[in-house]
Amino acid sequence: MLDKVKNVIVVLSGKGGVGKSTVSTQLALALRHTGHKVGLLDIDLCGPSVPYLLGLEGSDIYQCDDGWVPIYTDESKTLAVMSIGFLLKSRTDPVIWRGPKKTMMIKQFLQDVKWDELDYLIIDTPPGTSDEHITVMECLREVPCNGAIIVTTPQGVALDDVRKEITFCKKTGIKLLGIVENMSGFVCPHCTTCTNIFSSNGGIELANLAQIPHLGTLPIDPRVGILAGTTASVLSELPESSTAEVLKGLVQHLDTLTAQG
């Protein structure tokens, strides 16, 4: 039930392990920090990370007459979260489902969660281009989906998979809002100097090639990693960091896009 949701943003990655869930989570927290009411929907069925990243593991969800009730991280209900992880007994429990059951569960999460009034719903998807993604796109055709943000790392193998993701989005008709390059450089926790330990600027080059916006470059910052397991935003805890600057720019970019309709 997305009738009370003003804006829907899908976060995609062509490859696993690029930090997509961390970007989704910190984007949701940044939007909340700037005064928005936000929902975060984790439909990465085989690798749900959001409950861990927000310190919500062990939370119980229940159903009311109107559907699933999400987990709220605060009394003001400014951040609502739903994940398959809440239905598992342990983070190590595998989800051994065939395609049709996965499709059914994703449809349930997209159609049967009782969201309150939300300014933004961030949808954290599985990596790749699979049946799950097709199901998401089909369901979102019935609601005003603003578009997709693609997360990548600078390495060539990740960028190759992002090219497939871009093609997938174009074929399924979802608007590409831009690319975020993650894990580009390492920030020393002592002197905050950023050193490129992998290749760099691959996300920028790919964005230029695909003619879509480059939304920012995020480094590996151990200080950001320490925030995992809490609902603390980088914007409040590390306001001077390069990660905070990128997230501020991303929030402003989304606010501008949504204001334009």
Curated annotation (Swiss-Prot):
Pfam assignment, any one: ParA
Necessary cofactors: [4Fe-4S] cluster
Binding site for ATP: 14-21
InterPro entries: Mrp-like_CS, Mrp/NBP35_ATP-bd, NUBP2/Cfd1_eukaryotes, P-loop_NTPase, YlxH/NBP35
Intracellular or extracellular location(s): Cytoplasm
Gene Ontology CC annotations of this record: cytosol
GO biological process entries: iron-sulfur cluster assembly
UniProt keyword list: 4Fe-4S, ATP-binding, Cytoplasm, Iron, Iron-sulfur, Metal-binding, Nucleotide-binding
Gene3D superfamilies: P-loop containing nucleotide triphosphate hydrolases
Cofactor-binding details, from the entry: Binds 4 [4Fe-4S] clusters per heterotetramer. Contains two stable clusters in the N-termini of Nubp1 and two labile, bridging clusters between subunits of the Nubp1-Nubp2 heterotetramer.
The keyword Iron appears for this protein: yes
Cross-referenced PROSITE patterns: MRP
Binding positions for [4Fe-4S] cluster per the UniProt entry: 188, 191
Protein's UniProt keywords contain Cell membrane: no
Gene Ontology MF terms in the entry: 4 iron, 4 sulfur cluster binding; ATP binding; ATP-dependent FeS chaperone activity; metal ion binding
Recorded family membership: Belongs to the Mrp/NBP35 ATP-binding proteins family. NUBP2/CFD1 subfamily.
Function: Component of the cytosolic iron-sulfur (Fe/S) protein assembly (CIA) machinery. Required for maturation of extramitochondrial Fe-S proteins. The Nubp1-Nubp2 heterotetramer forms a Fe-S scaffold complex, mediating the de novo assembly of an Fe-S cluster and its transfer to target apoproteins.
PANTHER family per the UniProt record, alphabetical: CYTOSOLIC FE-S CLUSTER ASSEMBLY FACTOR NUBP2 (PTHR23264:SF19), NUCLEOTIDE-BINDING PROTEIN NBP35 YEAST -RELATED (PTHR23264)
Quaternary structure, from the entry: Heterotetramer of 2 Nubp1 and 2 Nubp2 chains.
Name listed for the protein in its UniProt record: Cytosolic Fe-S cluster assembly factor Nubp2 homolog
Species this protein is from: Drosophila willistoni
